[in-house]
Amino acid sequence: MPVLLDPENALALDVLLAGTDAQGLDWHLSAPDAADLPRIRGIGTLSSAGNEEISFLSNPRYQNQLATTRAAAVIVTPDVAQARQEQGASGHVLVVCKHPYLLYARLAQWFERASRPAGPAGVHPSAVVDPSAEIDADARVGAQCVIEAGARIGRGARLGPGCVIGAGSTVGADSLLHPRVTLYAGVHVGERAIIHSGAVLGADGFGFAPDPTLGRGAWGKIPQLGGVRVGNDVEIGANTTIDRGALDDTIVGDGVKLDNQIMVAHNVRIGAHTAIAACVGIAGSTTIGERCTIGGASMLSGHLAIADDVNISGGTAVTSNIAKAGRYTGVYPYAEHSEWQRNAAVIQQLALLRRRLRALERE
């Protein structure tokens, strides 16, 4: 169900926009003559929004829904607003903005804050807190949390039920850890981070050395002595794991966004404002630049260097360095099974076909 404010808390559209972080987005209102600005209780899609909700159009493929939406107001680009004016379309209050998706995001943030108050600060009686741990008076520690020796919880930080904060770990100001997040010892999370349930930061990296003294083919464990450092304004999805470094720390830069079920191995470094979709695996000691995007289920081999501003399509296997910004794709497209088998058989013979072609060219 969408978030709806109680009727008595509904806000006039202009008041709502002025109360969000929308001021820097250069928006203006376009309303039918003599129209009263609507009072807004929530936000929804064009197809589902009611007459007390605001909606948005950021993808042109949904433009036909403007004619049928029940939304009280719609966020659109200047081009869409001008086209509707030229067509004589009327009836909707428009919020005209060059970046409708971003304005929608700001409004969604406002509605989330309005509908989900943080609750009182303090430590739940069932939490277990080591005497040497430091918890800011404005922080909130939920039921069944465990805070180990020397850990520090910053101002305004919120820990959901069942979180574990290992020895010497830190959680920065205004960060939110959802229920059952685990930070092993020596993990440092910056300010305003959001970490979703089941995420584990600081487990041992996959480090083993062949050790014949233990038996034929046996492996000896390499203790992982580094930690994990997460920057400010980072979001980490549910059940994502970030391993501690072998000697140096594993680094997640400021503004990085990690989806659910991502594996970040030891000594990986992820540059600022990189976004990585679900089920990506990043092997050890790979460095990813700033402002990169990595599609879901991609796999990155270890000890690679990925440049800034690289976009990797979903499902791509990256096995060598990427030194130049741009888009990279390594996905073999799906097809009907019989067709795929025929194409795969040809691919296995490419070297032979190449030799035959060169022989023909020499004749």
UniProtKB/Swiss-Prot annotation:
It is an enzyme of class 2 (transferase). Gene3D superfamilies: Hexapeptide repeat proteins, MurE/MurF, N-terminal domain. GO terms for cellular component: membrane. Pathway: Bacterial outer membrane biogenesis; LPS lipid A biosynthesis. One of its GO terms (molecular function) is N-acyltransferase activity. Its EC number is 2.3.1.191. InterPro entries: Hexapep, Hexapep_transf_CS, LpxD, Trimer_LpxA-like_sf, UDP_GlcNAc_AcTrfase_non-rep. It comes from the Bacteria. It catalyses: a UDP-3-O-[(3R)-3-hydroxyacyl]-alpha-D-glucosamine + a (3R)-hydroxyacyl-[ACP] = a UDP-2-N,3-O-bis[(3R)-3-hydroxyacyl]-alpha-D-glucosamine + holo-[ACP] + H(+). The active site is at H266 (proton acceptor). The keyword Oxidoreductase does not apply. The keyword Zinc does not apply. Keywords: Acyltransferase, Lipid A biosynthesis, Lipid biosynthesis, Lipid metabolism, Repeat, Transferase. Homotrimer. NCBIfam families: lipid_A_lpxD (TIGR01853), PRK00892.1 (NF002060). Catalyzes the N-acylation of UDP-3-O-acylglucosamine using 3-hydroxyacyl-ACP as the acyl donor. Is involved in the biosynthesis of lipid A, a phosphorylated glycolipid that anchors the lipopolysaccharide to the outer membrane of the cell. Belongs to the transferase hexapeptide repeat family. LpxD subfamily. This is UDP-3-O-acylglucosamine N-acyltransferase. The lineage of its organism: Bacteria, Pseudomonadati, Pseudomonadota, Betaproteobacteria, Burkholderiales.
